[in-house]
Amino acid sequence: MLYQQIAKNKRRTILVMAGFVFLVALIGAAVGYLFAGTATGGVIIALVIAVIYVSIMVGQSTDVVMSMNNAREIHSADEAPELWHIVEDMALVARVPMPRVFIIDDPSPNAFATGNNPQHAAVAATTGLLAIMNREELESVMAHEMTHVRNYDIRLQTIALALTAAISLLVNFAGNFMWFGASSRRDDREEGAGGVFAIIGSILLIILAPLAATMVQMALSRQREYQADAGAVELTRNPQGMISALRQLQHAEPMQNVDPASAALYISDPQENARHKSLSGLFDTHPPLEARIERLEKM
C-alpha cells in the first residue's frame, strides 16, 4: 500500500509539471500573438525566460530561502543536540548526505527542506517545533523533510517557483504594453471576427495566467506533502509518530514572520490556522491535515 501511494503521487506530479510547462508555453503564445503576430516566437521566448529563471533559482535557492525566513544555521550538535542527531540519523536512513541545518526563532511548530539536490540540501525547524514535539514526532517530521530531499521535491518546488515568476514577468510585460500591442495588431489589418476573438482570447489568457499558475503550484505542493508523509512512514517504520506529529500541527497558530513565497515549502501551512482552510482547497498550499492523517491511518 505504501509503495503504491508513492507511485501514484509521482504520476500525479508528472502531470502537474506538464501542465505548468504547457501554461508557460500558452502564455508565451498569447503574448507573441498580441505583440508580434506569431505565437511560435512567443512560445520560444517564454520557454527561454523560464529556463533562465529556473537556472538562477536552482543555483541560489538555499541561501535565498533561508534568508527570506530569517533562519540561522547551526554548525554542530552542540547548538541543538537532539535536532542535529535526528537529522543525521534520518539522512543516513534515507541514504542522502547530511544536509545543512537551520533553526527559525518562532513559537509556531513547523519545518521545511530546500536546496537543489540531495548533495546541496538544507532543513529548517522552528523553535516551536523543537519545544513541542517529542522525539518520535520530531523524527517523523525530519523523515518527512528527508523524503522531500531524497525525492528531489526541493528542486521541483524551486522550479515551480521559478516558472510562476516567469509567468508573472510575461504577464507584467503584457499588461504594460497591452494597448500598444492590440493597436499594432489592428494596424496589421487583421480586424476580422477571427482576429478579434483571437485577440480577446489572448488578453483573457494573460489576465487569468497568474491565477492558473498559482493553482498549479498549490496542486503540486499538496501532492508532494502526501508523498512525503508516506515516505516518512517508510523511513521510520512508525506511522503513529507521523500521525501524532500532524495532530500536533493541527493546533498550531500561524507563524509570526514568514515569506508567502516560501509557504508551500513548510510541512504545514505557516500562514493560517490549520482549522481554517479555504472551502475549495484550490488555493491551499497544503492538503488538510485531517486528510493527511486519514491516509496514514489507512496504510
UniProtKB/Swiss-Prot annotation:
Lineage, uppermost ranks: Bacteria, Bacillati, Bacillota, Bacilli, Lactobacillales
Main location (coarse class): membrane
GO molecular function, one term: metalloendopeptidase activity
Disulfide bonds listed in the record: none
Organism this protein belongs to: Limosilactobacillus fermentum (strain NBRC 3956 / LMG 18251) (Lactobacillus fermentum)
Co-factor: note: Binds 1 zinc ion per subunit.
Entry-linked NCBIfam families: PRK04897.1 (NF003425)
Protein residues bound to Zn(2+): 144, 148, 225
UniProt protein name: Protease HtpX homolog
GO cellular component: plasma membrane
HAMAP family: Pept_M48_protease_HtpX
Membrane topology listed for this record: Multi-pass membrane protein
Localisation per UniProt entry: Cell membrane
Family: Belongs to the peptidase M48B family.
Top-rank lineage group of the source organism: Bacteria
Record-listed E.C. numbers: 3.4.24.-
Alphabetic keyword roster: Cell membrane, Hydrolase, Membrane, Metal-binding, Metalloprotease, Protease, Transmembrane, Transmembrane helix, Zinc
Iron is among the record's keywords: no
Active site: 145
Gene3D superfamilies to which the protein is assigned, alphabetical: Metalloproteases ('zincins'), catalytic domain
Cofactor: Zn(2+)
BP terms from Gene Ontology: proteolysis
